[in-house]
Amino acid sequence: AGAFVSRTALAGTLSPIDAGRGLPPDSYAAMVETFGPEVLDTFYANMFDDPTQLDRFLASRPRRPMDELREEMAAFRAAVLAAAPVRDIYTKKIVTSRDRIFTGRNQLRAWGRDTATVHAWPHFPFFQFVDWQDLLSA
């Protein structure tokens, strides 16, 4: 197997917990503090803008213990906030403008208008495509 020919960032940023370039820190903290089935269901719903795609996802939704997910979210927050700035390794940046997790505005602020491709997609656009190549070709 050869080296990767491209590295694509999709629906996120190098600053995942950041008021201007990711998720606002206070919103993320509130999500961790109040995390439970209702918060998770809201998160899943916000990944989509098409109820049919949400239903498709929910039909095979991940089944993990709530306490495990909450611990993972808290550990992720701690790691992100303690980390040094990350080097941009991506050759392609796709901003999802209908994203209700990472707003399109924050994604554009993070990547820059001149370096990102903007698509009117939700946070989880995968059900709209046959495969990864189909998504990259859109």
For each of these PLM feature ranges, what is it?
Residues G2-T34, E72-A74, Q128-D131:
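Flexible "cap/lid" loop of the alpha/beta hydrolase fold
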Residues V5, I89-Y90:
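Short coil/turn segments at beta-strand junctions that form active-site/ligand-binding loops
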Residues P16-A59:
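Helix-rich cap/lid subdomain of alpha/beta-hydrolase
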Residues R56-A82, V86-D88:
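Hydrophobic, aromatic-rich cap/lid helix
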Residues R87, K93-V95:
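Short beta-strand/loop motif that positions the catalytic acidic residue
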Residues T96, R100-N106:
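Conserved alpha/beta-hydrolase "acid-adjacent" motif
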Residues R105-T115:
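Active-site-adjacent alpha-helix of alpha/beta-hydrolase-fold enzymes
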Residues D114-A138:
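Catalytic active-site module of serine/aspartate enzymes centered on a nucleophile-bearing elbow/loop
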